[in-house]
Amino acid sequence: MKNINPTQTAAWQALQKHFDEMKDVTIADLFAKDGDRFSKFSATFDDQMLVDYSKNRITEETLAKLQDLAKECDLAGAIKSMFSGEKINRTENRAVLHVALRNRSNTPILVDGKDVMPEVNAVLEKMKTFSEAIISGEWKGYTGKAITDVVNIGIGGSDLGPYMVTEALRPYKNHLNMHFVSNVDGTHIAEVLKKVNPETTLFLVASKTFTTQETMTNAHSARDWFLKAAGDEKHVAKHFAALSTNAKAVGEFGIDTANMFEFWDWVGGRYSLWSAIGLSIVLSIGFDNFVELLSGAHAMDKHFSTTPAEKNLPVLLALIGIWYNNFFGAETEAILPYDQYMHRFAAYFQQGNMESNGKYVDRNGKVVDYQTGPIIWGEPGTNGQHAFYQLIHQGTKMVPCDFIAPAITHNPLSDHHQKLLSNFFAQTEALAFGKSREVVEQEYRDQGKDPATLDYVVPFKVFEGNRPTNSILLREITPFSLGALIALYEHKIFTQGVILNIFTFDQWGVELGKQLANRILPELKDDKEISSHDSSTNGLINRYKAWRG
């Protein structure tokens, strides 16, 4: 990939001038001038997804200039580099090929001259065989009983993705109860173990190296708990499987390496749900539905890699995000799914975006002089409306929002879904167009309010509007449509990383805290007063020691 400071491009300079012309233009003005704005600024994908980006502070000229920026930064070349297996994660010297994991067309994808697809397909087949044995009840625990509960032990990408997907696709789940443990806080594993029976529980230990501190601490606690009931260590093999590449450590733990599911160093953690890390998804919804999830993502991969940039949905969303982040100074983006099953979607892409593009050094190793990744946050609608929408509507910060909803619900209870969707539509309308002083005054006059009350209250009731949103309407949340939606956001993040000239697929920012924690841990073993750190850290450690007794 090319190393280009985006601010030094002609397109960026043109965008800066264009911003000066656009900064006072309102969304209401744009709609008033163009009755066809929706049709010009929306697109469908596979008759499964409608993306409406018309309620943004953009014009056709804005998008054209943003497309020029993408061209100058050689986005097309970067896309080809990723899909062809080039080692675009240069700081770790790795290819980035989560797209190979869902390559349902099975066309060869090469890394170091070797086609990775045979190995990908072999692991998928192994996942299929294993999951069918568990789901059918053919696989028995140490007392001859079938498995009823699955506990996935992992953290970061080994937890967030599988947990999000199994929750989002709960309407497709089978009889197995799914549990997820991530936090090294013993409370997390303790509370899960209260709910399960050692005779009928399968643990999935998800750690590529089988050395991740949080995961292995929880795995050993689960093993100890299991052996208190089972007694004989040989029974571990019937109740534990590994998602790892460290066969030696897996075997030493007591897991049969036949039940070790591999993945590769070209699979990044936050893009790993498509790999063996997704075994918990397979066990929850069945292999056929998992294949549908892969197929939806693959369809979006094809769209992203073959569609011209001006009609390319991940590219459009990425460019609009850069427009707000770098020109309007918007520091955050909210992801607001109007579907309770999607309640972990924002948390998943909090990691997906912030761990990918939360970088202050460019691909040349230079400190950047522009904004990189935004802060990502969000909650399901309508809960968020009663929590933080106040700030989005009337606060002093611009918060671009993505609203996501299915047209068809899995739970058609009376008029619940119509009420939910009426809020979905109303919020984007309110954010875009607001409520003027004149309208508020007329409402108060119609209510017979006296002029003094009217003059005092009116300013508090005015909504400026002009708050930007994207609306993503899905026909229904299915494995296919969810796969496509996840891939849409993945490729948006990649596109932004390319243009912002940063390495999206490493995560060195997680390392320093881990190193320091490993240094501090031995200091917590005794009651000696600590003086080896700064005064704040010393004070905190010493108060902890005093209070723990």
Swiss-Prot record:
One cellular component term from this protein's GO annotations in UniProt: cytosol
Pfam families in the cross-refs: PGI
First-tier enzyme category under EC: isomerase
Gene3D superfamilies assigned: 1.10.1390.10, Glucose-6-phosphate isomerase like protein, domain 1
Gene coding for it: pgi
GO molecular function: carbohydrate derivative binding; glucose-6-phosphate isomerase activity; monosaccharide binding
Family matches, as HAMAP family: G6P_isomerase
Organism (species): Escherichia coli O1:K1 / APEC
Keywords of this entry: Acetylation, Cytoplasm, Gluconeogenesis, Glycolysis, Isomerase
GO biological process, alphabetically ordered: gluconeogenesis; glucose 6-phosphate metabolic process; glycolytic process
Residue numbers carrying N6-acetyllysine: 80, 228, 234
Family: Belongs to the GPI family.
Pathway annotation: Carbohydrate biosynthesis; gluconeogenesis; Carbohydrate degradation; glycolysis; D-glyceraldehyde 3-phosphate and glycerone phosphate from D-glucose: step 2/4
Name assigned to this protein: Glucose-6-phosphate isomerase
Recorded catalytic activity of this chain's protein: alpha-D-glucose 6-phosphate = beta-D-fructose 6-phosphate
